[in-house]
Structures are given as C-alpha cells and as structure tokens.
C-alpha cells in the first residue's frame, strides 16, 4: 500500500482525504493547527472547514512535518497559493525518497506570475520529486464530502503520472479524466475565480440571469485567450477545467469567490468582505496576477481589468459594469475573425 500524505487540512484537502480512504488508502494529513489535528484524530471530523461530514479512522492527522512526508509515495499539496512555497520549504528536508507530487489549489502567484506547478518545480529538488500532477475541475468540497457525483481532471507533463493519480482517486462517486495540457488546466482553474467574483457582484447588484450568462460566456472567452497565448490547448477551456469549473464556481453558494463578489455587489468594502469570509478568496490575488499577465502577453481581458479597478483602485462596482457595457462594438468571435483574415491575406 502506498503512503499518501495530504499537506493541508482545509475543506478541499479533507474532502480528498475522504475519497482516498474510500478507495482503501490510509492518509496522513498535515496541518500546523493542533486543535484541527485533534478534531481529525479524536472526533473524526473537521468542524472548521468541512462540518457535518464524518471522517474515516484511516485519516490520521499530524502537526509533525517529518512524520507526514517521510517515506511518502504521493504528496498532495492542498494549501492556498500564497502558502505553497513556505510549506514546500518546510517539507523538503524531511522527504526521504522520490514522490509524486499532486497539487489541488487554483491560483497564480502575483509578481512572479508563475503557475503552481512552476513554483513546485522551483521549490522541489529533482531528487525528491518524480512528477508533478494537477488535480482540478468543478468540485465543491462540501459535495465531495457528501459523496455526490463529481468529475475532475488529472493533468501532468507525464501521462504515466497523471494515470497513476487517476487510479488513486477514481471511484463510483469521483470520476477522474486525464489531460496532458497542464498549462490550460491550471490557467482555467485559476482564472475562473476571477469570473466567479464578478458573477457574485452582478448577483449582489440584482442584475439577474441575463447578466450572469453574458459574464460567464465572455469570461470564458478571455480565459481562453490568455491561456492559449500562454501555450494552453484551446480545447481544454471547453472541458471540465474550463467551462465546467466556471459554471460551478459562478453559480453556487458553496463558492467562496461568488460569495465574496456577492458581498462586494451589496456594497461591502473588500477588507470587510475578506474578514467576513474567514477563508482564503483566491480570486482576489489571482485578479492581480491575471491583470499583470494580460499586459505581459498583450491579451484583451476587459472583465479582469474592470474587476482589478474595483478591487485595487476603489472603483464602484456599478461604474465597472457601466464601463464594460459601454465598450466599443466588436465581433463576438473577434479572435477567430482576425485569425481568418490574416490567413486570407
């Protein structure tokens, strides 16, 4: 039996640990909070992040990083993007053999503009990692914890590693596909949080279904524009980690990013929203990173730019919506039309 370690005991890490134990694995969950580990080991629950879900006794918690990662065959990183470097640096000295690393977070590092797998390639020496795999898709932890049907994608530069992770997680409640396009998978997973924030804002403003449908559709267009420019496969954005993740994150009350946007739409200040949420809202940091990427790659991302104005420059949400609706007219399939015209020339 493989030793599987989960770095992070938030809602998603806990839900995935449950999937793994349903498949007959023992999982060691690491967290820095002793009270959280006590809940997992003694009460077999995680009231803080995944309430009302009974955890398997095969999930063992620890605050000791050496105990967690020593001799691990698979190490799953389930911490927010901003904590990944620090957690990996804590783990590396205690890793005793090459492991497959799986990350399940969705974000881009501001300033460096690195995807999470790129951060991991930098922080993990070649003598401790076999491969890096991303597990992503439309998957709320609350529903996974209740064993509702869920489908995700495992992506890696190594299809062997992606298939290994597919086999580790797949069961009758949790279906896993593979996809070699790690760039597209990571970009889709990260940037959908931006559109979810914007969708929450339109709902908070009471704008209704028409506005949300337009936002999701045009949001997908700018995600695909940037992702393709960065080297992703355009088809990936029509899959689970593109349109699939976008739909679930923009329409569900489980979505932290949607809930945060909803409060912004109702007039709350950003700092008050983040305090009210009490958990990481990845879309805020990702908006800053995506805005920087749009400039770097010279890609039009009007929704991202409008949200950036709201979050970081104090623009009113109503003004941001008005600016989007007042943009100059263009063709819906502008990129395709331009490509076709260039080919004709």
Swiss-Prot record:
Sn-glycerol 3-phosphate binds at residues 106, 137, 139, 192, 245, 255-257. One of its GO terms (cellular component) is cytosol. It is an enzyme of class 1 (oxidoreductase). Induction: Appears to be expressed at very low levels, which could be the way used by B.subtilis to regulate sn-glycerol 3-phosphate synthesis. Does not seem to be inhibited by sn-glycerol 3-phosphate, in contrast to the E.coli homolog enzyme which is very sensitive to allosteric inhibition by G3P. One of its GO terms (biological process) is glycerol-3-phosphate biosynthetic process. InterPro entries: 6-PGluconate_DH-like_C_sf (IPR008927), 6PGD_dom2 (IPR013328), G3P_DH_NAD-dep (IPR006168), G3P_DH_NAD-dep_C (IPR006109), G3P_DH_NAD-dep_N (IPR011128), NAD(P)-bd_dom_sf (IPR036291). GO terms for molecular function: glycerol-3-phosphate dehydrogenase [NAD(P)+] activity; NAD binding. The keyword Cytoplasm applies. It comes from the Bacteria. Catalyzes the reduction of the glycolytic intermediate dihydroxyacetone phosphate (DHAP) to sn-glycerol 3-phosphate (G3P), the key precursor for phospholipid synthesis. This is Glycerol-3-phosphate dehydrogenase [NAD(P)+]. It comes from Bacillus subtilis (strain 168).
């Amino acid at each position: 039996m493989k030793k599987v370690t989960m770095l992070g005991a938030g809602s998603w890490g806990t839900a995935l640990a449950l999937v793994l134990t349903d498949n007959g694995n023992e999982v060691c969950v690491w967290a820095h909070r002793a009270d959280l580990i006590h809940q997992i080991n003694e009460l077999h629950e995680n009231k803080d992040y995944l309430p009302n879900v009974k955890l398997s006794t095969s999930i063992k918690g620890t605050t000791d990083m050496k105990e967690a990662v020593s001799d691990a065959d698979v190490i799953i990183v389930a911490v927010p993007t901003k904590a990944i470097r620090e957690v990996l640096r804590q783990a590396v000295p205690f890793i005793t053999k090459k492991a497959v690393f799986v990350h399940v977070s969705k974000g881009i590092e501001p300033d460096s503009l690195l995807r999470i797998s790129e951060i991991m390639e930098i922080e993990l020496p070649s003598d401790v990692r076999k491969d890096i795999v991303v597990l992503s898709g439309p998957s709320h932890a609350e529903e996974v914890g209740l064993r509702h049907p869920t489908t995700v994608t495992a992506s890696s530069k190594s299809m062997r590693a992606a298939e290994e992770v597919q086999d580790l997680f797949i069961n009758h409640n949790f279906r896993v596909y593979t996809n070699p396009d790690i760039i597209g998978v990571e970009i889709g997973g990260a940037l959908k949080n931006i559109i979810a924030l914007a969708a929450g804002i339109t709902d908070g403003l009471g704008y209704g279904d028409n506005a949300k449908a337009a936002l999701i559709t045009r949001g997908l267009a700018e995600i695909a524009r940037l992702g393709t420019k960065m080297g992703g496969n355009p088809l990936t954005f029509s899959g689970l980690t593109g349109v699939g993740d976008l739909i679930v994150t923009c329409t569900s009350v489980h979505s932290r990013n949607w809930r945060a946007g909803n409060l912004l739409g109702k007039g709350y200040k950003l700092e008050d929203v983040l305090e009210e949420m009490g958990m990481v809202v990845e879309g805020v940091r990702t908006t800053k990173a995506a805005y920087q990427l749009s400039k770097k790659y010279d890609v039009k991302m009007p929704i991202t730019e409008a949200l950036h104005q709201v979050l970081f420059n104090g623009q009113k949400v109503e003004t941001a919506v008005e600016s989007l609706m007042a943009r100059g007219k263009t063709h819906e399939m502008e990129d395709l039309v331009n490509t076709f015209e260039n080919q004709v020339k």
